[in-house]
Structures are given as C-alpha cells and as structure tokens.
Amino acid sequence: MQFHFKVADAERDRDNVAATSNAAANPHAALQPQQPVALVEPKDAQHEIRLQNIVATFSVNCELDLKAINSRTRNSEYSPKRFRGVIMRMHSPRCTALIFRTGKVICTGARNEIEADIGSRKFARILQKLGFPVKFMEYKLQNIVATVDLRFPIRLENLNHVHGQFSSYEPEMFPGLIYRMVKPRIVLLIFVNGKVVFTGAKSRKDIMDCLEAISPILLSFRKT
C-alpha cells in the first residue's frame, strides 16, 4: 500500500519527509500474520492521509492579566469557575487559543503545521498589542491528529487477540480498537470499516513511519 498526504497539505509542508523503515528497532515488526492474506491490494493503490487537527504550545514569557485580555478583545471568553484560562478564537487561520496567567498558550484547531505557526504568532501579537511585554518562545508541535481510509474491512477481534500487548478492544463501550504504537509513540483508533485515526504524532514523518509498520499488520487481518 502507498500513502500520501492530502495535496493541499503536502504542498505547504515544510519538511515534506518520506516514510522510512525502522523494522529492526520496532517491537511491532516481530508480530507476523498467522495466515497468508487472500486478497492483496495493488502496489500502486493510493491512500490519502488527511490532517484533522494540530495542537501547538508556546510561551509569551510574561504573566498575563486574563480579565483585562477578555474585556479588551473580541471572540474571547473567560469563566474562571469553569476553566482557568482565556479561550480566544481566530477566524483566519481558524484556530483557538487557551491562554493562561503564566504566559503559556495552547493553540488548537489548525488544519496543518503552517496554520498552527501563523495562528500562534497572531495570538502572541494580539497580546503584545494589549501592552504585555511579549516574547514568542518555546513554540512546539504537541499533537497531530490525522485520518486515513484503508478501504477494506478489518477483523478487530482477531487483531486484538494476536496484538493484545499493544491493543484494547471493548466494542460495547467504543466501536474502535485502540492500538498503542511503541515506535513511533502514536495511538491509533482502528475501525472495522478500515478507517484509522492517528493521535499523538509530533510530525508527518511519525505518521508515515507508523503506517509503514501497521499497514502490513492490518492487511493480514483483512476480512475476506
């Protein structure tokens, strides 16, 4: 199987990294399919990876007056009894900031890395315009959420039975199988219809490396 990021995202990706194989150092590689696969996808089959959410954090390196921020800005809310930070929303790029008194900020909702960076810097600029001695520091991508449709059904019960050391599956509580990848450290939500959600990735390379490791495993548990 071959994978690629959605074109609109790939064109804006700074790194544009390709997948690399780490089978020798990957504990998942030792788990082989128990039986041969009857149906094998063509090698040129393409699967589009879609970025759904980027979470980034940064610091403005100063203490913030949250009441003043809320009263002097639009598209913000502050209810300290419910949440101890200011929630500020931005329309372009579409993202949300969680702003804390310590100067720590969480930016979430961006659809790619560039939007996360631009949105974070715009939020810092807004705080600077309010008179705070802002320094944009410690910017870091914390979580990339992505999805892919493998376009084949998966036998989740069998997968959980063989890979129980990495997975948990309780269909009465949640319809997907939770698979905890060790290298790279990513959590996958795998559904019977072949849809997969990736959470916890730090880069696109993490997602591609994860797919490199997990796709042969999932293909071996394909429903026939």
From Swiss-Prot:
It is found in: Nucleus. It comes from the Eukaryota. This is TBP-related factor. The gene is Trf. Sequence repeats lie at residues 51-127, 141-218. The keyword Repeat applies. GO terms for cellular component: nucleus; polytene chromosome; transcription factor TFIID complex; transcription regulator complex. Residues 17-34 have a biased composition (Low complexity). Its main location: nucleus. Belongs to the TBP family. Pfam families: TBP. Acts as a transcription factor. Binds to the TATA box promoter element which lies close to the position of transcription initiation. May be essential for embryonic development. Residues 14-34 are annotated as: Disordered. InterPro entries: TBP, TBP_CS, TBP_dom_sf, TBP_eukaryotic. CDD domains: TBP_eukaryotes.
